[in-house]
Every structure is written in structure tokens, then in C-alpha cells.
A protein has these predicted regions:
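Interface amphipathic segments
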Residues: 1-60, 86-177, 187, 203-296
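Disulfide-stabilized extracellular beta-strand modules
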Residues: 190-192
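Short glycine/proline/serine/threonine-rich loop/turn segments at secondary-structure transition edges
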Residues: 70-71, 187-188
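Short solvent-exposed strand-capping/beta-turn motif centered on an Asx-Ser/Thr pair
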Residues: 66-68, 183, 298
Length: 299
């Protein structure tokens, strides 16, 4: 097993003249959601046993065939999680309504024919829902389709996953859809439509008395045809306030080959105050930036 995740395996592994021959089936005997939770990076610590949890899971699959320099065994791996929940005992909010359905499959001897199906993925961080789905048909032309939607309240989120010495607040709404083929060589992208809105943002470091406040941003990313040329990233507004000093701006980038941009930034910021909130090791910045900039151009 791995961490607290145990599984049974039966079958054989043989060594013919060429390669390795596999005929293995595996399944998890324990349907407790907490066992698969132990695989999440950072979760399996000394305090893991004290985490409250509920929900069920199933895990099963097989690997069958010859592994050589030019071929792989066929395989089918399935994971399902139903109504999962976990909560740290010292924190007020759980992560619950975790539902996942995932299958990774290859019925051939070629790795490029591997498919990934995630028709269901959803969870609630307290009262903050996230849901989505994803399909990748193969690793050859990377034909894919997916969607991700969510609403996050950062103050509530940090009551589940606290960040020592830092206070956060703000509301994040996002939605994203992608469908099509990805080919980096020929600069082909899936058709993409994504929207992002962040409002009432707040960041405060315990070692500095002032907070970064009124953080806001509205952005969209779009590529209707799935090409670099029609890719548009539009940050229609962004800004923040620090001890009465404001920064406001916008930026639009179109055509990721030509990198045509149009943007503006106006306001003032004290670099020493910013570094106090977001410290960078072995780095010291001082000075005040005052700006009223409009810029248009291409790379």
C-alpha cells in the first residue's frame, strides 16, 4: 500500500525472451474515503489520524500485456469517490460533498492511445463550491474537452486551510471551458472561454500593521477558433489600495504570436510597504512609484 491506502493485487509477472509480461488485477479492499485522502500531498502527517472524515470510494483496475521498448501493456484504472468529507479537528469548516469519477484507460499497446475520463468532479470548501469535468481522448493529438466552475470566499477558505501569519479575504468567481486539440508544434489550442472576477480582496501580514485592501480584478480569456492568432486575454480592470494610495489599471493582449497589447496603469505605490506584506528572501526594495501610463504596441 501507499500511506494509508491499501490495495490487493493478484496475477503474475513473467520474463519472456523480450520485455516483461504483465497480467495483474488490483482493487482496494477498504471503501473508506480517508484511505485515498492519505495520497494527497501534505495530508499524510503525524496528525492524519485525528482528521474527521466520511464518504466512500472504490478503486480497481488491471494491467495486461507485454512491456517492451516499443509497446506497453493495456490497462484500465478506475477511481470513484462518493460524498467524501474531511475536517481538521481544530478548524471550524470541512471540505465536503467530494464526488469524483475517473477512468484512465488504454486498450492498445501504444502509450499515445491512453485516454482520461473525468465526467464528475465536485467539492465544497465550506460553502464554496467547485465543479468540473475533463476528457482527454489520447496523447497523440490531445483532443480534449473540459469545464471548471467555482466560487471561493478566501476568508472562509483560510478557516479550512490557514496560512500562518497572513490574513486573507475576498470573493473569487470563475468559469472556464475548453474544447479542441492541443498541438504546441503547430500552435493549435483548444477553443477557450474563461471568465474571472475577484472583488473585496484583502491581504495582511501579521508583521506589518497595514493591509493591502480593495483588491479587485476582472478578466477574460478567449479563443473561439483555437489558435494563437485569435487568443485574447483581457484584464478589463485591476487594482488595489495600500494606506490610502491606489493603483488602477487595465490590460488587453491579443494574438499571442504578434503579442499586441493595450493597457494603462495609474496611481502610486510604496515599494517598501509592498515588500513588508509580500517579503522576498534576500531582497530589499525602497522607493515610491507614481504612474499614469498608457501603452499600446506589439512584441
Amino acid at each position: 500500500g501507499l500511506n494509508d491506502f491499501l490495495f490487493n493485487m493478484n496475477g503474475f509477472i513473467a520474463l519472456p525472451e523480450e520485455g516483461v509480461d504483465y497480467d495483474l488485477a488490483f482493487a482496494a479492499p477498504d471503501s473508506d474515503f480517508k484511505s485515498v485522502l492519505s495520497l494527497v500531498p501534505g495530508m499524510y502527517t503525524e496528525s492524519f489520524s485525528s482528521i474527521k472524515s466520511s464518504g466512500t470510494m472504490s478503486f480497481e483496475g488491471f494491467v495486461k500485456g507485454l512491456y517492451t521498448e516499443t509497446s506497453i501493456p493495456s490497462f484500465d484504472i478506475n477511481l470513484q469517490i462518493k460524498d467524501g468529507m474531511f475536517q481538521y479537528p481544530e478548524l471550524p469548516k470541512p471540505v465536503d460533498k467530494i464526488n469524483v469519477n475517473m477512468a484512465v484507460k488504454n486498450e492498445t499497446s501504444q502509450l499515445e492511445n491512453t485516454s482520461i475520463q473525468i465526467p464528475t468532479f465536485s467539492m465544497n470548501f465550506g460553502s464554496n463550491p467547485i465543479s468540473g469535468n475533463f476528457t482527454l481522448q489520447n496523447l497523440r493529438d490531445y483532443l480534449m474537452e473540459g469545464e471548471l466552475n467555482g466560487k471561493l470566499n478566501l476568508k472562509e477558505l483560510t478557516s479550512i486551510f490557514p496560512i500562518e501569519g497572513t490574513s486573507l479575504a475576498g470573493n473569487l468567481d470563475f468559469s472556464a471551458r475548453a474544447k479542441g486539440r492541443y498541438d504546441s508544434t503547430n500552435k493549435v489550442l483548444p477553443a477557450i472561454a474563461a471568465q474571472f472576477k475577484f472583488s473585496e480582496g484583502y491581504v495582511k501580514n501579521a508583521e506589518y500593521p497595514a493591509a493591502l485592501e480593495k483588491i479587485h480584478a476582472v478578466a477574460s480569456i478567449r479563443s473561439d477558433k483555437g489558435s494563437m492568432q485569435d487568443f485574447v486575454a483581457d484584464f478589463s480592470s485591476f487594482g488595489f489600495e495600500l494606506e490610502g494610495e491606489k493603483i488602477e489599471g487595465n490590460l488587453r493582449i491579443a494574438d499571442f504570436e504578434a503579442l499586441n497589447w493595450q493597457g494603462a496603469v495609474a496611481g502610486a505605490v510604496d515599494l517598501e510597504k509592498i515588500m513588508a506584506i509580500f517579503p522576498i528572501a534576500d531582497t530589499e526594495l525602497k522607493g515610491k512609484i507614481q504612474a499614469n501610463i498608457n501603452s499600446t504596441g506589439s512584441y
